[in-house]
């Protein structure tokens, strides 16, 4: 893969939609998002990122370094588990971190090298902790 980008880049996407809905609001029955003052349609950054992800996925078709991490209907832990397996890391990350303190950097580098959208937009990565948090009203009464 080529040298990573060292600078930050901002971009603007201008497009025109006539008789369409480029970014429906799921909380409002998929109605178009509209600026109440101007009457112009609004498109969120999330929508633009999805359009870019879809374009790159279509153009590159899983080419090395251009895979997409955030896919509709695909759990993120599949890609996380693949990274752990490929790097030969113990799935028990607490034990793995004791053995190798640089494990976070290795995981970050792997994910950035393989996933276009992580490199481009960044990502909040999991801590790979399995399990659930249980909150009960009894716990609130104790405080």
Task: Spell out what each predicted region is.
Residues 80-129:
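A generic, well-ordered mixed alpha/beta core segment in the N-terminal half of proteins
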Residues 135-138:
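Conserved small/polar residues in nucleotide/adenosyl-binding loops
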Residues 2-83:
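An N-terminal structural lobe/cap that precedes and organizes the functional/catalytic core
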Residues 143:
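Phosphate-rich cofactor/ligand-interacting catalytic cores and adjacent structured alpha/beta frameworks
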Residues 1-3, 130-131:
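A generic local secondary-structure boundary/capping motif
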Residues 1, 29-30, 102, 107:
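Hydrophobic alpha-helical segments, principally membrane-spanning helices and signal/leader peptides
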């Amino acid at each position: 893969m080529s040298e990573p980008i060292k600078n930050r880049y901002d971009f603007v996407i201008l497009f025109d939609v006539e008789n369409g809905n480029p970014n429906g609001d799921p909380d409002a029955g998929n109605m178009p998002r509209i600026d109440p003052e101007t009457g112009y349609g609004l498109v969120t950054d999330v929508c633009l990122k999805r359009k870019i992800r879809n374009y790159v996925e279509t153009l590159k078709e899983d080419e090395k370094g251009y895979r997409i991490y955030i896919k509709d209907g695909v759990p993120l832990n599949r890609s996380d588990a693949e990274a752990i397996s490929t790097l030969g890391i113990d799935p028990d990350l607490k034990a793995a971190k004791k053995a190798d303190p640089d494990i976070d950097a290795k995981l970050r580098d792997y994910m950035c090298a393989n996933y276009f959208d992580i490199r481009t937009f960044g990502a909040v990565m999991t801590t790979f902790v399995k399990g659930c948090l249980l909150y009960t009203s009894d716990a609130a009464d104790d405080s």
